[in-house]
């Protein structure tokens, strides 16, 4: 038996299983934290993964619904657990995801109580040679946010992408991505604008790049980002460079973060691709 992928939504998993049945390939679903899709005949793995890639591009394609009707199992009999809102938040994120999220919220509250400047004096990228050995500064800039929209946007993506990485690959991988991308995106942004910047967006862009490329090159990892969302992130990135929104955007951090995530995903999947 070979696990092909996992879906957070059991109905989506059932749609893919039904479609593959019409193609003569039998898959089974095992319900754990997510809906795990398993293949008994491992010789068919290549074909299944190719079909999975097409399915993930457009799960709403009518052919998949038609397959469910053809199989006579649009009502599959699965029981779907209903999660309250906060239980859903907990379910889809691990301890490191939550730790960073709560730190960002705490820092944002302090910024609103004390003002940005006192907080930046303690957390900003080293702005004086005497501060270069205060190691936390190379990462703590990511905890600061300067508007409600800024923090909501970043934390939503952090929870969605960081939670997926931590749940499917492990806390260690998320820690490594976060530390490296915060350091490199901060360094690049410092070269562009000096030390007075902040936000988790460099890390978020790293996660976008990592999750997308890891999912493309290693579908069995269980993480993926729809191509439409990675396209949206690129459009947002380009718009930031041309100041379309009229806001101060850390473009250097965004580009460096995205490049870091792509590079890490490439390295992490290189061995498996060579072996294949």
UniProtKB/Swiss-Prot annotation:
Pfam families, A to Z: Rhomboid, Rhomboid_N
NCBIfam families from the UniProt entry: PRK10907.1, rhombo_GlpG
Molecular-function GO terms, alphabetical: serine-type endopeptidase activity
Catalytic site positions: 201 (nucleophile), 254
One GO BP: proteolysis
Protein name per the record: Rhomboid protease GlpG
Transmembrane portions of the chain: 94-114, 142-162, 169-189, 192-212, 229-249, 252-272
Reaction it catalyzes: Cleaves type-1 transmembrane domains using a catalytic dyad composed of serine and histidine that are contributed by different transmembrane domains
Organism for this UniProt entry: Klebsiella pneumoniae (strain 342)
Keyword Cell inner membrane appears in the UniProt entry: yes
InterPro entries according to UniProt: GlpG_N_sf, Peptidase_S54_GlpG_N, Peptidase_S54_rhomboid_dom, Rhomboid-like_sf, Rhomboid_protease_GlpG
Keywords: Cell inner membrane, Cell membrane, Hydrolase, Membrane, Protease, Serine protease, Transmembrane, Transmembrane helix
């Amino acid at each position: 038996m070979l696990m092909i992928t996992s879906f957070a939504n059991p109905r989506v998993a059932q749609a893919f299983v039904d479609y593959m049945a019409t193609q003569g390939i039998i898959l089974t679903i095992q319900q754990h934290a997510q809906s795990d899709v398993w293949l008994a005949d491992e010789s068919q793995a290549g074909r299944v993964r190719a079909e999975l890639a097409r399915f993930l591009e457009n799960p709403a394609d009518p052919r998949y619904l038609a397959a469910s009707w053809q199989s006579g199992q649009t009502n599959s009999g699965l029981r779907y657990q209903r999660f309250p809102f906060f239980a859903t938040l907990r379910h889809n994120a691990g301890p490191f995801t939550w730790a960073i999220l709560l730190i960002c919220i705490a820092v944002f509250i302090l910024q609103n109580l004390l003002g940005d400047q006192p907080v930046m004096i303690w957390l900003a990228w080293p702005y004086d040679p005497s501060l270069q050995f205060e190691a936390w500064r190379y990462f703590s800039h990511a905890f600061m946010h300067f508007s409600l929209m800024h923090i909501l946007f970043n934390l939503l993506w952090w929870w969605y992408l960081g939670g997926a990485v931590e749940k499917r690959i492990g806390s260690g991988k998320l820690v490594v991505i976060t530390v490296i991308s915060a350091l490199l995106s901060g360094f690049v942004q410092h070269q562009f604008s000096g030390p007075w910047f902040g936000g988790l967006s460099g890390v978020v862009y790293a996660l976008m790049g990592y999750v997308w490329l890891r999912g493309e090159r290693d579908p069995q990892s269980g993480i993926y980002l729809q191509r439409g969302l990675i396209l949206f992130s690129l459009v947002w990135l380009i718009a930031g460079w041309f100041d379309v929104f009229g806001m101060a955007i850390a473009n250097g951090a965004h580009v460096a973060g995205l490049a870091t995530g792509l590079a890490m995903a490439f390295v992490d999947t290189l061995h498996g691709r060579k072996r294949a």
